[in-house]
């Protein structure tokens, strides 16, 4: 199974699945009953793009772009953030997880980030029924430029020091 959502266009929601025919039929029936079928025009556009481009070369370029942006995020975090805040070292994908100390009011931290136009997502958004609000945030480096990432991380870093100390 795989997706073209992040490699061709964010939000595309078109993917692929290989496997035994009976398994694929069951998955397709479940998908059609729960989320409906993807518009045929979207699927045809993806098929045309895949017939037109060198997808492997495209993936290599996407990986380079995201690695550059990830490195910018990590470098800026290490430069600006409180030493009490932890950041995962991504091994792929487009997101890093930042974990705050347990004694920090993460709702207030989140609001302070939003007030300063720094977009982060609370970890509870990725948990069933909002459970596990916890003290972690997802940071994305897909859309912003390297300069925007650096500026955002400088602001975020200052806020981590304000909320957590050095």
Predicted regions and their residues:
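PLP-dependent class I/II
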Residues: 1-166
